[in-house]
From Swiss-Prot:
Residue span of motif CXXC: 225-228
Protein known as: Envelope glycoprotein gp62
Function: The surface protein (SU) attaches the virus to the host cell by binding to its receptor. This interaction triggers the refolding of the transmembrane protein (TM) and is thought to activate its fusogenic potential by unmasking its fusion peptide. Fusion occurs at the host cell plasma membrane. The transmembrane protein (TM) acts as a class I viral fusion protein. Under the current model, the protein has at least 3 conformational states: pre-fusion native state, pre-hairpin intermediate state, and post-fusion hairpin state. During viral and target cell membrane fusion, the coiled coil regions (heptad repeats) assume a trimer-of-hairpins structure, positioning the fusion peptide in close proximity to the C-terminal region of the ectodomain. The formation of this structure appears to drive apposition and subsequent fusion of viral and target cell membranes.
UniProt organism field: Human T-cell leukemia virus 1 (strain Japan MT-2 subtype A) (HTLV-1)
Signal peptide from the UniProt entry: 1-20
Annotated site (Cleavage): R312, A313
Lipidation (S-palmitoyl cysteine): C462
Effect annotated for changing V330A: 30% loss of transmembrane protein cell-cell fusion activity
Comment field (misc): HTLV-1 lineages are divided in four clades, A (Cosmopolitan), B (Central African group), C (Melanesian group) and D (New Central African group).
Region ranges (Gly-rich): 327-339
PTM field: Specific enzymatic cleavages in vivo yield mature proteins. Envelope glycoproteins are synthesized as an inactive precursor that is N-glycosylated and processed likely by host cell furin or by a furin-like protease in the Golgi to yield the mature SU and TM proteins. The cleavage site between SU and TM requires the minimal sequence [KR]-X-[KR]-R. The CXXC motif is highly conserved across a broad range of retroviral envelope proteins. It is thought to participate in the formation of a labile disulfide bond possibly with the CX6CC motif present in the transmembrane protein. Isomerization of the intersubunit disulfide bond to an SU intrachain disulfide bond is thought to occur upon receptor recognition in order to allow membrane fusion.
Length: 488
């Protein structure tokens, strides 16, 4: 009896710890080698929420696809709508019918290989009637281009489901598994809502290693650069490995396929190598060879210098430019006035020559008319002499000739206005105003000078300020810390 009571007391003492350690506090979504924790959820708080990026999910699934020869859809397009297909571990009986809605289809069972499908048909084994998920109660999601928000009821956590994009001819499928789990005691490194401890924490905390590398980088640049870390998925991370350490020939499981792997035979780290990299398959494997280090892409950028407070303009430069502009305007006005005066005199001389030519042509025309009258008079006299033979033309047995002189062109030439009135010598406006020629030209010159002065006052300070800040706007090149062509 005493042993039973002691056992019962120990059970009640450790029961809260056991229940607290294994009671689920969230739902973990797994795709490829990456996992994403939902916001805290449990039977009392049954809504489990995720905020995901479809491009990152595609990169994670490419590391460990659910089916061989998967035809992936790399460039996600905004015009393609997203659909959700729940899956079940045990395929239910098919009795026909099933739940159907615009953003949700009937549950299907995963079947390889993918063949490509559209959203309104079940892509694998066809629709089933029971069990099914209700779209609003069990699962719902919102989509903004490649950003996805999923809300899943806690009772459905533990079942896999897939996301489908309506793109005929492709299989843009993301196959996701869910299981109840506990939130990690500390925040995951770098990637939010992702449990990467099984890859990044083989020995000492991985975050301290990254901080040590950042500190060494800052010291090497004498704290003149900024270290920028790219918060991306594991598929875009880099690996430094030592080719001097051999990899065991025993079979091992690939854990990560990095986007860049660089050999570093002469690199000395402040700590030991943490992972095992196999150069033959270009992947991080599970063997404990410790010849590599995983790190995210990070780059160096120069520290921007603080510039002095910019003034509106330099007064000396403004007045200097204004004086130069005014001098140029005065010189241009005087030159223009002189050219206008010389042009006026030239037009006057040309007009005099034209009038003299016109008078000469008119006199010649009048003389020609008199000659024509004399010829007509002689013709009439000869016709009277040869009246008996039938006239002069019949007596000569020739065709009669007549003189036709027109006066229209000479009339048009006399009616032409003076050349000075037909040629524009100013701005093409009526600047008469009852003033003399020099007064009109002086008025035009003054208006030109005022317009130039206003233009310099308005645009001069802006142009000078832009010229002063032009050297400080030269961009510095972006240097990557990991350069494939550099010798580490």
């Amino acid at each position: 009896m005493g042993k039973f009571l002691a056992t019962l007391i120990l059970f009640f003492q450790f029961c809260p710890l056991i229940l607290g350690d294994y009671s689920p506090s969230c739902c973990t979504l797994t795709i490829g080698v990456s996992s994403y924790h939902s916001k805290p959820c449990n039977p009392a708080q049954p809504v489990c929420s995720w905020t995901l990026d479809l491009l990152a999910l595609s990169a994670d699934q490419a590391l460990q696809p659910p089916c061989p020869n998967l035809v992936s859809y790399s460039s996600y397009h905004a015009t393609y709508s997203l659909y959700l297909f729940p899956h079940w571990i045990k395929k239910p009986n098919r009795n026909g019918g099933g739940y159907y809605s615009a953003s949700y289809s009937d549950p299907c069972s995963l079947k390889c290989p993918y063949l490509g499908c559209q959203s309104w048909t079940c892509p694998y084994t066809g629709a089933v009637s029971s069990p099914y998920w209700k779209f609003q109660q069990d699962v719902n999601f919102t989509q903004e281009v490649s950003r996805l928000n999923i809300n899943l009821h806690f009772s459905k956590c533990g079942f896999p489901f897939s996301l489908l994009v309506d793109a005929p001819g492709y299989d843009p499928i993301w196959f996701l598994n869910t299981e109840p789990s506990q939130l990690p005691p500390t925040a995951p490194p770098l990637l939010p809502h992702s449990n990467l401890d099984h890859i990044l924490e083989p020995s000492i905390p991985w975050k301290s290693k990254l901080l040590t590398l950042v500190q060494l980088t800052l010291q090497s640049t004498n704290y003149t650069c900024i270290v920028c870390i790219d918060r991306a998925s594991l598929s875009t991370w880099h690996v430094l490995y030592s080719p001097n350490v051999s990899v065991p020939s025993s079979s091992s499981t690939p854990l990560l396929y990095p986007s860049l792997a660089l050999p570093a035979p002469h690199l000395t780290l402040p700590f030991n190598w943490t992972h095992c990299f196999d150069p033959q398959i270009q992947a991080i494997v599970s063997s404990p060879c410790h010849n590599s280090l995983i790190l995210p892409p990070f780059s160096l950028s120069p520290v921007p210098t603080l510039g002095s407070r910019s003034r509106r303009a330099v007064p000396v430069a403004v007045w200097l430019v204004s004086a130069l502009a005014m001098g140029a305007g005065v010189a241009g006005g005087i030159t223009g006035s002189m050219s206008l005066a010389s042009g006026k005199s030239l037009l006057h001389e040309v007009d005099k020559d034209i009038s003299q030519l016109t008078q000469a042509i008119v006199k010649n025309h009048k003389n020609l008319l008199k000659i024509a009258q004399y010829a007509a008079q002689n013709r009439r006299g000869l016709d009277l002499l040869f009246w008996e033979q039938g006239g002069l033309c019949k007596a000569l047995q020739e065709q009669c000739c007549f003189l036709n002189i027109t006066n229209s062109h000479v009339s048009i030439l006399q009616e032409r206005p003076p050349l000075e009135n037909r040629v524009l010598t100013g701005w093409g406006l009526n600047w008469d105003l009852g003033l003399s020629q020099w007064a009109r030209e002086a008025l035009q010159t003054g208006i030109t000078l005022v317009a130039l002065l206003l233009l310099v006052i308005l645009a001069g300070p802006c142009i000078l300020r832009q010229l002063r800040h032009l050297p400080s706007r030269v961009r510095y090149p972006h240097y990557s810390l990991i350069n494939p062509e550099s010798s580490l």
